[in-house]
């Protein structure tokens, strides 16, 4: 993002509490979050007719806030007509991902609950977007995979924060394990198909003998093999860190995210997915579902469920895209995001919002008018005047 147009700050805050059982090694452990805030340097000089926009990006499992950096300048420059302007952008690392994982090392437990992750997002977003000097704005949440799940969960938990949800193949319903299983195992117990677990282990290595082995693996053996070259380089540069206890250049390298925490993102899903599945029906916001045409990451029931259950659902299929379409074909996804934001802004009641400075007496008059209007809509005539 252009440095003269936006100021970048990296911040740290405490994660939401209390959390799901076993989310930390000890009950007294407290987790932290690291996130980036991009604030417009031009926000005070904006035209009153331009809609102000805040964007919150949520990454998928095994990723981090860095996967979205490629998007930022291309989203900022999208509206040449001046219908809207971006005020703030938030990029968040979940507690066991990226820079947050580094801060929480030694405290993370075996239960990474995506609902807790949504609560973390809400804590940051309400703080950053709801400050007393904030102007009326449209808040848009954009989430991929796990982040799409969490975007939906955010609207369930706090339905008045986000105005538009853009979901890039959110993972809500997953494939069930087919096999002997364990007799009597409750359906909401942690479980993962063994073949999926083994495949994930090969794609989520976290320790390497040296820099060369690290780069070779990230380019040829990780989930990001087919990622856009710039995004892949951003990931390589961001995830690299020295192995514990090694301060020498040329020594062992590790990723910021531990492999075990990466695997836990998938192993725990059956324990918290039922909550969202039961509550998606209450999401009323316009919800854009972007999905790659050739993705087979989720079973067909995932898309069918969202299409049937969400009240304001819009499907947008990216030709040739996979589940990782956000990192493999980012320009196509950016084009669709810009289109949906532009379309939403033009029909938004906040497009020309401006709150004048009013005295207490003027506010009282304003309320009386609002109450009379509300009463006229709510009042139902009855045959008896009194109860």
UniProtKB/Swiss-Prot annotation:
What induces the gene encoding this protein?
Answer: By oleic acid. Transcriptionally up-regulated by YRM1 along with genes involved in multidrug resistance. Expression is also dependent on RSF1 and RSF2 for transcriptional induction during growth on glycerol-based medium.
What SUPFAM superfamilies does the entry give? alpha/beta-Hydrolases
Span list, region Peroxisomal targeting signal type 1: 385-387
Keyword Hydrolase included in the entry's annotation = yes
Please give the GO cellular component terms listed in this UniProt entry.
peroxisomal matrix
Keywords, comma-separated and alphabetical:
Hydrolase, Peroxisome
Q: Enumerate the subcellular locations listed in this protein's record, separating them with semicolons.
A: Peroxisome matrix
Gene Ontology molecular function: any one: triacylglycerol lipase activity
Instruction: Note the InterPro entries from the entry.
Output: AB_hydrolase_1, AB_hydrolase_fold, Carboxylesterase_BioH
Annotated coiled-coil segments of the chain: none
The encoding gene:
LPX1
The record, for Pfam families, names: Abhydrolase_6
Name of the protein in question: Peroxisomal membrane protein LPX1
- Superkingdom: Eukaryota
Location, primary (coarse class): other
One annotated GO biological process: triglyceride catabolic process
Q: What does this protein do?
A: Has acyl esterase, lipase and phospholipase A activity.
- What further fact does the record state? Present with 2350 molecules/cell in log phase SD medium.
Hydrolase among keywords: yes
EC numbers listed for it are 3.1.1.-
- The EC class name is hydrolase
Q: Summarize what gene deletion causes.
A: Aberrant morphology characterized by intraperoxisomal vesicles or invaginations.
């Amino acid at each position: 993002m252009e440095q003269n147009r936006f100021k970048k700050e990296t911040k740290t805050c405490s994660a939401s509490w209390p959390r799901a059982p076993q989310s930390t090694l000890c009950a007294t452990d407290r987790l932290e979050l690291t996130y980036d805030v991009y604030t417009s340097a031009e926000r005070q000089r904006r035209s009153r007719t331009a809609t102000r926009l805040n964007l919150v990006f949520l990454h998928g499992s095994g990723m981090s806030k860095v996967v979205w950096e490629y998007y930022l300048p291309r989203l900022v420059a999208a509206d040449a007509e001046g219908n809207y302007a971006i005020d703030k952008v938030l990029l968040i690392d979940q507690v066991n991902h990226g820079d947050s994982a580094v801060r929480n090392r030694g405290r993370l437990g075996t239960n990474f609950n995506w609902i807790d992750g949504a609560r973390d997002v809400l804590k940051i977003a309400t703080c950053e977007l709801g400050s007393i000097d904030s102007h009326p704005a449209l808040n848009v949440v954009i989430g991929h995979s796990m982040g799409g799940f969490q975007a939906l969960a955010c609207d369930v938990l706090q339905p008045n924060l986000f105005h538009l949800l853009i979901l890039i193949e959110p993972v809500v319903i997953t494939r069930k394990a087919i096999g002997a299983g364990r007799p009597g195992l409750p359906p909401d117990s942690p479980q993962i198909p063994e073949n999926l677990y083994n495949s994930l282990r090969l794609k989520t290595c976290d320790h390497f003998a040296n820099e060369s082995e690290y780069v070779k693996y990230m380019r040829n053996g990780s989930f990001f093999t087919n990622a856009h070259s710039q995004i892949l380089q951003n990931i390589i540069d961001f995830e690299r860190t020295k192995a514990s206890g090694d301060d020498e250049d040329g020594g062992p390298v590790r990723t910021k995210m531990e492999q075990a925490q990466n695997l836990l993102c998938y192993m725990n899903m059956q324990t918290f997915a039922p909550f969202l599945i039961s509550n998606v029906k209450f999401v009323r916001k316009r919800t854009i579902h972007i999905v790659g045409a050739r993705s087979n990451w989720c079973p067909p029931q995932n898309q069918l469920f969202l299409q049937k259950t969400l009240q304001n659902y819009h499907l947008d299929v990216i030709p040739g895209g996979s589940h990782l379409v956000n990192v493999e074909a980012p320009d196509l996804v950016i084009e669709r995001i810009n289109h949906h934001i532009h379309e939403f802004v033009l029909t938004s009641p906040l497009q020309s919002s401006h709150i004048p400075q009013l005295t207490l007496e003027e506010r009282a008059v304003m309320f009386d008018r609002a109450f009379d209007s509300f009463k006229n809509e709510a009042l139902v005539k009855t045959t008896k005047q009194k109860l």
